[in-house]
Amino acid sequence: MFNWLNFFNFFFFFLFFVFLTTSFNFFCLVLTSELMWALLLLISAVLGSILDDFFLASFAFLLLGFASVELSIGLILMVYLKTTNLSLNLAAHKGSSYATLFLLKKGASKKKI
């Protein structure tokens, strides 16, 4: 009866191993961690409903809350990184309003080498 739960456990630890060992870009890391949270939520919700355990079923909603907080932090970081990269790309032009003194010195030092 619980053989299909072994598949969910295997899939969770497989995703956890992939998350720890491979180097993706930031977007892939956020998606992988969301899959891990969703799988934990599914496992705890199914076990809570099968075993008729109120604590385990409420724990699934706690995991759902953690997953939503983690997703929002990940999206905020992605927007921040995208904005930073966009401003750095715009700072490459001398006439850009984003060109700060630090970035202009950084560009000048690269030209000397």
Curated annotation (Swiss-Prot):
Keywords: Mitochondrion. It comes from the Eukaryota. It is found in: Mitochondrion. The keyword Mitochondrion applies. This is Uncharacterized mitochondrial protein ORF1. One of its GO terms (cellular component) is mitochondrion.
